[in-house]
């Protein structure tokens, strides 16, 4: 601490504006068990019809059906059947005679499901100059959109897919104004141009796609009704979980004593649903939402209130995670520390009950790292030091929450094995790329808010200083970084077969929620009103059956 001036160690950081809490409409929610049972029975009755359709479908038709099921949010009902069908397509069908639409659909579905498919399948649509043949492709809107969707699963070195993205973006943008405003095709096209389908949050996209599918003259009424029933079933489950979380949060009474911390259970839970939306992951969602609230309380204590001297005390207490450390802390920090200790004990109890005790020491280790990383950020800010971009990003790998999130969910997924933990400790590219996407999206979205008055640094500030770049140049660079890291994610998604698929999914979904929440300079966690329409759709307004 000797490196800091006397004034700096006792100064409080500039407080970032915390948006007022959204109205609590969930704590008093009571699940209608009779209605939920009706939804469940309706889903089961239709599931057999849908399964029969899936098992009977062949070749191109089965791929279209799988894509429809997944877009409608129904894929989890048929995981085994979908995998069997795709494996057969992967092994037995080369697709040489497929048109553009079907070739791109096959490529995308197989890559989405962790199968390696060469991009050379698109060579047949290229001319001698290495460009896509404009005729007849530019008049095939469905084919162009299918290729556009597929191009976002590219990895490094796949120049044909980069060319596909340029080609399809140009022609789809040109064609879009010519389409009927209310046609399903235009609605899908507009959405895809705004936000690539592969990077969509599945349950949020399902709400959109159900409304689009309902307009489609070729829709299947069985699938449409099942999608609506399934969505409403999930929504009721989400309301129940949000009710439990709201009561847990209100009972803690942290806000009256710690007014500087974020008060957004709803925002935390939105993240949890985005990471794991399926009904069987209720415990996982609850753990994620609580962890986000805990991490936010600790982060805000460092960012918004603690002096350097006080922050050092908190960091040292977190290093030990022992209740006896509480007497070393200022009164307000004791509240935060009790919160951390209480949940740590709950986590340890759950891990023990589930016979996943291996997760406990690694959770504690990640919590210690998180405290050190938050403390480092505070020191940089208060001493007005701008670290190198690389140093800042390395620290951000920890503050992104990717590593601690993995350790927290592992016991709830019965995956807290030494093999899985060792994989995480090796700092795999899948985790680091996810963290970089998270940080870049975060700072692109919240740079203006956090840099108001020039008080709080972001990674953009570090990059601009180090490279002498303008803000616009830096923003452009960050967008390129995000695209590069997504290529890493796409490659690692297929390559990481040493982990259960459900564990690998957290990284892909983490990157998806980062892009969704922070697009258009928004910060959905700090200010949930930015995604209010999405929030109402997920948690408030049921679909009309």
Curated annotation (Swiss-Prot):
GO molecular function: gamma-curcumene synthase activity; magnesium ion binding; sesquiterpene synthase activity
Reaction catalysed by this enzyme: (2E,6E)-farnesyl diphosphate = gamma-curcumene + diphosphate
Cofactor(s) of this protein: Mg(2+)
EC number: 4.2.3.94
One Gene Ontology biological process: sesquiterpene biosynthetic process
EC class: lyase
UniProt binding sites for Mg(2+) 3: 442, 450
UniProt comment concerning the protein's domains: The Asp-Asp-Xaa-Xaa-Asp/Glu (DDXXD/E) motif is important for the catalytic activity, presumably through binding to Mg(2+).
Protein known as: Gamma-curcumene synthase
Family, as annotated: Belongs to the terpene synthase family.
């Amino acid at each position: 601490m000797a490196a800091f001036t006397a004034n700096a160690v006792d100064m409080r950081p500039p407080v970032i504006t915390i948006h007022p809490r959204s109205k609590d409409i969930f704590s008093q929610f009571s699940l209608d068990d009779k209605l939920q049972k009706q939804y469940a029975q309706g889903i089961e009755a239709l599931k057999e019809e849908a399964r029969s359709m899936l098992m009977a479908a062949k070749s191109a038709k089965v791929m279209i059906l799988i894509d429809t099921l997944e877009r409608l949010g129904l894929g989890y009902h048929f995981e085994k059947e979908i995998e069997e069908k795709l494996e057969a397509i992967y092994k037995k069908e080369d697709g040489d005679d497929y048109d553009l639409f079907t070739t791109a659909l096959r490529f995308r579905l197989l890559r989405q499901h962790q199968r390696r498919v060469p991009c050379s399948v698109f060579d047949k649509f290229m001319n001698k100059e290495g460009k896509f043949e404009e005729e007849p492709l530019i008049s095939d809107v469905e084919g162009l959109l299918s290729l556009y969707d597929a191009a976002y699963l590219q990895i490094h070195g796949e120049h044909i897919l980069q060319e596909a993205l340029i080609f399809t973006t140009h022609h789809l943008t040109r064609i879009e104004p010519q389409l009927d405003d209310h046609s399903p095709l235009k609605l899908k096209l507009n959405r895809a141009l705004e936000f690539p389908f592969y990077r969509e949050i599945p349950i949020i996209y399902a709400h959109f796609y159900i409304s689009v599918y309902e307009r489609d003259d070729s829709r299947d009424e069985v699938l449409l009704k099942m999608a609506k029933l399934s969505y409403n079933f999930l929504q009721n489950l989400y309301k129940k979980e949000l009710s439990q979380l709201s009561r847990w949060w209100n009972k803690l009474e942290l806000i009256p004593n710690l007014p500087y911390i974020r008060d957004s259970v709803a925002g935390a839970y939105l993240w949890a649903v985005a990471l794991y939306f399926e009904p069987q992951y209720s415990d996982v969602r609850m753990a994620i939402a609580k962890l986000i609230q805990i991490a936010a309380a600790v982060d805000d204590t460092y960012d918004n209130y603690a002096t350097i001297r006080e922050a050092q005390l908190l960091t040292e207490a977190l290093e030990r995670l022992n209740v006896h450390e509480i007497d070393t802390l200022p009164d307000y920090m004791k509240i935060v520390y009790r919160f951390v200790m209480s949940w740590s004990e709950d986590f340890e109890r759950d891990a023990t009950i589930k016979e996943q005790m291996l997760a406990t020491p690694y959770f504690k280790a990640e919590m210690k790292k998180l405290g050190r990383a938050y403390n480092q950020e505070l020191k940089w800010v208060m001493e007005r030091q701008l670290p190198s971009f690389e140093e800042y990003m390395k620290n951000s790998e920890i503050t992104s929450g990717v590593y601690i999130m993995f350790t927290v969910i592992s016991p709830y997924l019965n995956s807290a094995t030494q093999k899985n933990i060792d994989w995480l400790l090796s700092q795999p590219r899948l985790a680091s790329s996810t963290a970089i996407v998270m940080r870049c999206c975060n700072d692109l979205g919240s740079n203006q808010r956090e840099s108001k008055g020039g008080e709080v640094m972001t990674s953009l500030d570090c990059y601009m200083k180090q490279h002498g770049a303008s803000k616009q140049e830096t923003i452009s660079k960050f967008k390129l970084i995000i695209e590069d890291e997504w290529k890493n994610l796409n490659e690692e998604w297929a390559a990481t077969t040493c982990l259960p698929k459900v564990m690998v999914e957290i990284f892909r979904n983490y990157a998806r929620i980062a892009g969704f929440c922070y697009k258009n300079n928004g910060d959905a966690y700090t200010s949930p009103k930015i995604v209010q329409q999405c929030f109402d759709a997920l948690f408030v307004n049921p679909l009309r059956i």
